[in-house]
Amino acid sequence: KIIYDTYESDVAEKGNTARRIGDEYRKAADKIFDSDAFPYESDICFGDIEFVPASYAENHGIPEYAIITNELELDKSYDLKEFGSKAGHLTVYVQSETVTAEKLAEVLLAIKDLFDKNGVTFYVIDCVLEYPKPEDGAQRDDFRMEVKDFLYSDIYEEEMVKRVTDNDEATKAYWQAEDE
């Protein structure tokens, strides 16, 4: 007796193909984050390709740029750079004694540069800049800077601090609304 069959999600909706691409992208991002060239203290850092089955594409919280899994082809060889530039999503938490918009702008510019040098593309980044955790492991919650869905195309020197500040404020408003 079959209780649960995953053929529909894994094969027909191309879930296995999306998982394979996502795993390769995550490995490429991890290689950068785990390297000596990554200059930041971070306990959370990873990369994903945003995929969604067509039946969930309109749900709350699904990014507009997510790739519809049903449109993938089984067993096709895909270009990670192309997928990264369309739907690559980095998540990075950085600990620093300096938590300012200027420092977060510096971090974003450095991460973009490092990923560019390693040929790994991304579309957006979520990045949290926070104080180091104390010895007891408790997180200070008095101040942090955070950008959510910060576009790769918005990471450049000119007026970077303003874009970071604007996104931080929008992100705080987003989380406030989600908590209500």
Predicted regions and their residues:
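N-terminal "mature head" segments of proteins
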Residues: 1-2
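Metal-dependent nuclease catalytic core centered on acidic motifs
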Residues: 7-179
